[in-house]
C-alpha cells in the first residue's frame, strides 16, 4: 500500500501527516462524508500532538453519557447517523462507556423526562452508526480485554490506565469525538502511549505498605497520581508485596488517573512490561516514597463522622465479586438511608441469577445497571433527593463529587454498609 505526505489545510494552518492509500481515499471522500469528517478530526488531533502518521486500531471505547454530550452533542451524533451517502458505520468493534441513566430506576433517581428523551436519542444515533451499547467502564473485566501491544482507542480514563498498565495494550485518553472517529476510520494518530519511548518510566515510587482494602488501593493510587502530576508521567512502582486482584488494580488505576491524569503505570515484577525496573526505566529516575501515614492522610482528608444522606458504590462500576461481597454484608440487615450499587449490564444478570441483587435490595439497597453515578446528572440527583453527605469506598468518586455539590466521605465497604444501616458514620 502506497504512502504519501499529505497537506491538509485547517483554518489557514497546513497539517502535514503521512497517509497510506486507504487514508487518502477516506480523506478525498471515497468512503463518504462521515468517514471523511472523522479523519479530518483525527488529522487535527494528530497535528496538535505531533503525530507523523496513523496506527490501525482493533477496537474503540466511546464516552457516551448525555450529561457530557448535551443537546449539541446528541444533534451532532444524529447528523452523522442520518447521513445516507457512503459508509457511516464503524469499521472496528466500538463500544460505549456508561450512559446517563438506568431506565428501570430513573424515577427513583429523579431523572426527568427530558433527560431520558435525550438519552434515547443518543442511543438511537449510536446504534445507527453501528456502535454496541455496552454501557460499561469495566470492559476489560466484562467485554474483551485488550492484549499486549494491541493498539486501541479508549476513552474512559480508568479503562485506559488499566488497559495500558495491566494488559500492556496501547491507548491514549481519547475524547468522545476522537474515540468515535477511531471507530469510524479504524485508526488513530500515532502519538503518546502508542509509542514505545513514551511508555518508559519517568519516576520511581517505592511503596512501604501494601493496601488491604479497595479504598486503601484507591488512596495509594490517588497519592501516586498527585506525585506524578501530569498525563505524560509514567510511574514505576516497587514494594507491592503480593499480586493485586483485578478489582484492587481497578480502583488503584482509576484513582491514579483521576488525581494525576496518569494513563500508564508499571508495577515492577508484576505488570507485563516491567519484569525488572531496568526494562522500563533506569536507576537515576526521580525517586519518591509512600508510607502508611501518606495513605492514612489521604483517607482522613475525605473522612468525617456524623449523618450520611446516601451511600454509593460506583466509579468504577462494580464487578460480580464486589457485588457478592456487598451482598454478604447485607444479609439480615435493613438500611436507614439509600444505598446505591452501580454495575454494568453484563454483570447485572449474573448478579440477579446468583442472588446478589435480591440480597442487596431486600436490605433496602438499589442495584443500578449501565450508568455511573457521577456521569448521570449527579448534581440534579442530589437536588431531587436532598442528598449532600455521600459515603463511598471509591477514591475516584470522592475526588470528583465535591465539584457537584456533595460532601463526599471515604470509607471502607464495611463502614459504608454500617453507615447505610445507622444513617451515620461513627
PLM regions with names:
Residues 11-426:
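Non-transmembrane, aqueous-exposed alpha-helical and coiled segments at domain scale
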Amino acid at each position: 500500500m502506497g504512502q504519501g505526505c499529505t497537506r491538509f489545510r485547517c483554518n489557514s494552518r497546513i497539517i502535514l501527516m503521512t497517509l497510506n492509500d486507504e487514508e487518502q481515499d477516506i480523506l478525498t471522500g471515497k468512503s463518504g462524508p462521515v468517514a471523511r469528517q472523522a479523519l479530518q478530526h483525527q488529522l487535527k488531533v494528530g497535528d496538535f500532538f505531533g503525530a507523523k502518521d496513523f496506527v490501525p486500531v482493533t477496537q474503540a471505547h466511546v464516552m457516551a453519557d448525555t450529561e457530557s454530550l448535551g443537546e449539541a452533542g446528541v444533534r451532532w451524533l444524529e447528523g452523522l447517523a442520518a447521513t445516507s451517502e457512503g459508509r457511516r458505520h464503524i469499521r472496528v468493534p466500538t463500544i460505549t462507556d456508561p450512559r446517563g441513566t438506568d431506565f428501570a430506576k430513573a424515577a427513583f433517581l429523579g431523572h426527568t423526562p427530558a433527560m431520558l428523551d435525550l438519552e434515547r436519542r443518543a442511543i438511537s444515533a449510536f446504534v445507527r452508526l453501528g456502535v454496541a451499547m455496552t454501557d460499561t467502564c469495566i470492559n476489560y473485566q466484562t467485554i474483551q480485554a485488550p492484549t499486549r501491544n494491541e493498539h486501541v482507542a479508549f476513552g474512559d480514563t480508568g479503562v485506559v490506565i488499566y488497559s495500558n498498565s495491566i494488559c500492556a495494550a496501547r491507548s491514549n485518553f481519547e475524547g468522545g469525538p476522537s474515540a468515535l472517529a477511531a471507530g469510524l476510520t479504524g485508526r488513530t494518530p500515532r502519538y503518546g502511549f502508542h509509542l514505545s519511548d513514551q511508555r518508559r518510566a519517568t519516576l520511581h515510587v517505592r511503596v512501604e505498605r501494601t493496601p488491604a482494602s479497595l479504598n486503601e488501593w484507591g488512596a495509594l493510587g490517588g497519592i501516586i497520581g498527585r506525585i506524578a502530576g501530569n498525563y505524560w508521567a509514567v510511574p514505576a512502582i516497587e514494594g507491592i508485596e503480593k499480586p493485586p486482584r483485578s478489582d484492587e488494580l481497578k480502583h488503584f488505576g482509576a484513582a491514579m488517573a483521576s488525581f494525576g491524569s496518569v494513563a500508564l503505570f508499571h508495577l515492577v515484577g508484576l505488570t507485563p512490561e516491567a519484569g525488572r525496573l531496568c526494562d522500563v526505566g533506569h536507576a537515576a529516575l526521580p525517586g519518591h516514597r509512600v508510607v502508611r501515614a501518606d495513605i492514612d492522610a489521604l483517607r482522613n482528608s475525605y473522612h468525617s463522622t456524623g449523618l450520611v444522606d446516601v451511600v454509593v458504590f460506583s466509579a468504577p462500576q462494580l464487578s460480580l465479586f464486589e457485588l457478592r461481597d456487598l451482598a454478604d454484608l447485607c444479609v439480615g440487615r435493613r438500611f436507614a438511608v439509600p444505598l446505591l450499587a452501580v454495575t454494568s449490564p453484563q454483570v447485572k444478570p449474573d448478579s440477579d441469577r446468583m442472588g446478589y441483587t435480591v440480597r442487596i435490595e431486600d436490605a433496602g439497597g438499589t442495584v443500578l445497571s449501565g450508568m455511573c453515578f457521577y456521569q448521570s446528572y449527579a448534581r440534579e440527583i442530589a437536588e431531587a433527593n436532598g442528598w449532600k453527605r455521600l459515603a463511598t469506598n471509591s477514591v475516584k468518586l470522592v475526588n470528583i463529587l465535591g465539584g457537584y455539590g456533595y460532601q463526599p466521605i471515604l470509607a471502607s465497604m464495611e463502614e459504608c454498609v454500617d453507615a447505610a444501616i445507622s444513617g451515620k458514620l461513627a
